[in-house]
From Swiss-Prot:
GO terms for molecular function: rRNA binding; structural constituent of ribosome. One of its GO terms (biological process) is translation. GO terms for cellular component: ribonucleoprotein complex; ribosome. It comes from Vesicomyosocius okutanii subsp. Calyptogena okutanii (strain HA). Keywords: Ribonucleoprotein, Ribosomal protein, RNA-binding, rRNA-binding. Binds directly to 23S ribosomal RNA and is necessary for the in vitro assembly process of the 50S ribosomal subunit. It is not involved in the protein synthesizing functions of that subunit. Belongs to the bacterial ribosomal protein bL20 family. This is Large ribosomal subunit protein bL20.
Amino acid sequence: MARVSRGVQAHAKHKKILKKAKGYYGARSKVYRIAKQAIIKAGQYAYRDRRQRRRQFRRLWIVRINAEARNNGLSYSRMINGMSKAGIEIDRKVLSDIAIFDKVAFAKIVDQVKQALSV
């Protein structure tokens, strides 16, 4: 039986891993074994942080809505409660943009919310 040389496949595999690790510091970009570990860890961080990014944006939107709602005499929780009672279905992302860029429209929304809360 003939001997199988896997040099071409091994070289391609190493090259692929080292290409992904380009820009890493020290041995993480030079040594195959360490580069492979670094890429696996980077993938774990990327997976985790894609989920954290969504949470962080939601927190940011809530902070912005709360700040502008308090400027108009409401807390965030009462604002959201009043919006559901008034039947206003604007998500937090859009509401935070309105709070930043269109304060007049946000004030009108707050007035509608206050009317819904007083009834």
